[in-house]
Amino acid sequence: MFPKTVKVGAHKYKVIYPYYFIEDNELMGSSYQFDGTLKIAKLSFDGTERAKDLIKETFLHELIHATCDIYERIEISRSDDNETIVKRLSTGWFQVLKDNDLLLDKKHEMPKSVKIGGFKWKIQYPYVFRDLTSSAMQVDYHHLTIRIGCAIETGLQASNSFTKHCLINAILKCICDSLDISKIGDDNRILSSLSEGFCQVFMDNKIQKIIRG
């Protein structure tokens, strides 16, 4: 169900599944940067097998913990509301990755729309902004539209990795706003840092294929 290892930034985590939390049978997963492990439970606290999607969501939850540890340790991982933030992020991202094909493995391709929560967002790509350095992505809440830049008027083309990051950035912004994660959604620095992390983790480890498989 899961790969043996996942790459988060420069770190490689070993995925241990199924793992049995003998010390605490109510624990469903754990992420430790120190020993580089993600541990995922197959059984619930009563000894019965958990639903497949719940196991996958736990994997994603712990992977998000690892991503926050590497890309935004001070503001997120060490905050008092860390677990609440990560739970909302994993809930939001699981739905997005499950319900949409984000075409992360297709160069210079974008989905025409993406369902985020109960809303269907239109994606305008390729979109030409006047200046990509000041505006490469735009989230239009009034028209449920995400615009992603591909070039500027001078003809300079955006790279594939740049446009994929813009897509992840826009979706993360929408998730944070819909699930009230203001600590990320209202801070462009944290938003950009974490979206960079999610883009790397999702693409390098083919996470969407795991969630949808």
Q: Residue locations for each model-derived region?
A:
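Active-site recognition of the HExxH zinc-binding catalytic motif
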Residues: E57-D69, K164-D177
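Extended, structured, electrostatic nucleic-acid-contact surfaces
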Residues: S161
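Metalloprotease/metallohydrolase-associated module, dominated by Zn2+-dependent proteases
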Residues: M1-D53, I70-A158, S178-G213
